[in-house]
A protein has these predicted regions:
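Amphipathic alpha-helical packing segments from all-alpha helical-bundle domains
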Residues: 24-31, 58-61, 76-102, 108-112
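Hydrophobic/aromatic-rich alpha-helical bundle segments in the mid-to-C-terminal region
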Residues: 98-147, 151, 155-161
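Alpha-helical DNA-contacting segments of helix-turn-helix folds
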Residues: 15-25
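Solvent-exposed, amphipathic alpha-helical segments
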Residues: 25-36, 117-125
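Hydrophobic alpha-helical connector segments
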Residues: 17, 31-61, 111-114, 141
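Helix-turn-helix
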Residues: 1-13, 17
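Short helix-capping/turn signature of helix-turn-helix
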Residues: 8, 71-77
Length: 161
């Protein structure tokens, strides 16, 4: 047991680095599928649904990582040891998302709403499933998109010709 601490400064460092690993992995899922939002052959809601589904499926396939991620994310330790790195890690995603929203919209708040709801609904599904994972995913997407679409630039929501 003591050997593992040779790789880390202390317990908090070990946990923060474990979170960073999970955070990078989740962000990688988001970014590797983000290009779907540029597919003009699909309407904007469908594009968002594809991206959401990839993220949802990843979370459902990794319940232990999800539980750790959520518990640490909402802890005091996250604020103290990992918040700054987390925000820097997501900076590129914030920038990518800006194109979908008017300048007056706080994109960080929108992304926080998306991720907070996604993670919360995924935790509910992992801990006490009421329906199949795919059905829970559809319901969660509807919940998120119903709010987010009110902030999206209208030109994104209009049918493409």
């Amino acid at each position: 047991v003591a050997y593992i601490y040779q790789c880390f400064e202390d317990k908090e460092d070990l946990i923060a680095k474990s979170f960073a690993f999970a955070d990078e992995e989740f962000l990688s899922v988001i970014l590797s599928n983000y290009t779907v939002l540029n597919y003009e052959s699909l309407d904007y809601e469908s594009r968002c649904r594809v991206l959401f589904t990839k993220c949802w499926d990843h979370l459902m396939a990794h319940p232990n990582e999800l539980t750790f991620y959520v518990r640490y994310y909402y802890s005091i330790s996250f604020q103290k040891y990992a918040y700054t790195e987390h925000m820097a890690r997501y900076k590129n995603l914030f920038e990518k998302m800006k194109t979908a929203f008017p300048d007056s919209v706080d994109v960080q708040k929108v992304l926080h709403h998306i991720l907070d709801t996604l993670l919360g609904e995924a935790m509910k599904q992992i801990e006490n499933p009421k329906v199949d994972n795919s059905i829970a995913g559809v319901l969660s997407f509807r919940l998120i998109f119903s709010v987010v679409k009110s902030y999206v630039k209208q030109t994104k929501l209009e049918p493409q010709e």
